[in-house]
Swiss-Prot record:
Iminosuccinate binds at residues 59, 80, 151-153, 168, 238-240, 255. It comes from Burkholderia ambifaria (strain MC40-6). The keyword Acetylation does not apply. Catalyzes the condensation of iminoaspartate with dihydroxyacetone phosphate to form quinolinate. This is Quinolinate synthase.
Length: 378
């Protein structure tokens, strides 16, 4: 395995007025509304969704009240690709994406004829920030013998430079297939997920050195101590986490796979190493079980995310109502980039169909664990 030497800065705006760093993101997180304000806003949003003939698609990591609203209005709460596919297949001509910018872009790529709105266009992603399209394209040009595989958490421009786009649910299978055909790979942007897949497949992978702000903060030593407090708990880990966290997992998988594991595993307590937003859906899916957040770098004093994405937290009821009322914050993707970016997405979907694999969890926990479980030492 090789890697780039690429420092990643999250605390500065990359382009003033278009994206924001961690500090700017936390400053833009809306205040929690009162119970009365919440009820008023939810009623207003429901009326506006009906008026605009719009559908709300939300990610598992946004706040619970937005997930509830999506469920209550016939929308969707899912991972980023399923959000985009739901929007593509829905009759609504206006999609309101509660998530981060690359999710809105992916929705627009799969639904170029639809209007895609977001509560805050500044809501970005550390993986996206850490992989600027111009730098990544130059890096790919320097290694023309390699197949370019990018994670879903990238901009439309980065996807347009790729041969394949993958999600955490199917990335291992696609890389294994490419490796079996003798292909060498550039992987971007998440170094932890890339390293995990490289170790599982043995593929020759040149890794871009990006990381998810949330998952990168989970700590192996603190997780080991927490496991000692809850000896019967199963540990659920997203593969964007560091290696010493993944090594302690009972199940390693995508957001959907982790929810599925929480339902199907015979345990009452789970330690969860992914964004805290997922706990809402886990508690709904498995109401008799207890979910414990995995430890990050500290107790609010030293962690940048404290297990919740600041850019996801920028989505709120008030700015959701505002975007529906005013029709602003629309996502646009250059048509030429959109056409090119769709090719690696369609290639992944075609691979999944040809191998009779779902991009999300299969529903067969044993099968999913064979791909994304890591019991004991890595």
């Amino acid at each position: 395995m090789q890697s780039t030497i690429k420092p990643v800065e999250y605390d500065r705006p990359i382009a003033a007025g278009t994206v924001c760093g961690v500090g700017q993101a936390w400053a833009k997180v809306p205040d929690a509304p009162s119970a009365e304000e919440r009820a008023t806003l939810k009623a207003r949003i429901k009326a506006l969704l009906a008026r605009e003939k719009a559908v709300l698609v939300a990610h598992y990591y946004v706040d619970a009240e937005l997930q509830e609203l999506a469920d209550e209005t016939g929308g969707c709460v899912a991972d980023s690709l399923e959000m985009a596919r739901f929007g593509r297949d829905h009759d609504a001509q206006t999609l309101v994406v509660a998530g981060v910018r690359f999710m809105g872009e992916t929705a627009k790529i799969l639904s170029p004829g639809k209007r895609v709105l977001m509560p805050d266009l500044d809501a970005t992603c550390s993986l996206d920030l850490g992989c600027p399209a111009d730098e990544f394209s130059a890096f790919c040009d320097a290694h023309p013998d390699r197949t370019v595989v990018v994670y879903a958490n990238t901009s439309a421009a980065v996807k347009a430079r790729a041969d394949w786009m993958v999600t955490s649910s199917i990335g291992l299978e696609i890389v294994a297939d490419l490796h079996a055909r003798g292909e060498k790979i550039i992987w971007a942007p998440d170094r932890h997920l890339g390293s995990y897949i490289q170790k599982k497949t043995g593929a020759d992978m040149l890794l871009w050195q990006g990381s998810c702000l949330v998952h990168d903060e989970f700590k192996g030593i603190e997780l080991d101590l927490l496991r000692a407090e809850y000896p019967g708990a199963k540990v659920l880990v997203h593969p964007e986490s560091p290696e010493n966290v993944v090594a302690q997992a009972d199940v390693v998988g995508s957001t959907t796979q982790l929810i599925d594991a929480a339902v199907k595993l015979d345990a009452t307590h789970f330690i969860v190493a992914t964004d805290l937003g997922i706990l809402h859906k886990m508690q709904l899916a498995a109401p008799g079980k207890t979910f414990i957040a995995a430890p990050t770098a500290g107790n609010s004093a030293t962690c940048k995310s404290c297990a919740h994405c600041p850019w996801m937290a920028m989505n709120g009821l008030a700015n959701l109502a505002d975007v529906l009322e005013r029709g602003h914050n629309e996502i646009f993707v250059d048509p030429a980039i959109g056409v090119r970016a769709r090719l690696p997405i369609d290639r992944m979907l075609d691979f999944a169909a040809a191998h009779k694999k779902r991009v999300q969890a299969s529903g067969d926990l044993q099968r999913d664990q064979q791909l994304f479980a890591n019991v004991g030492a890595a």
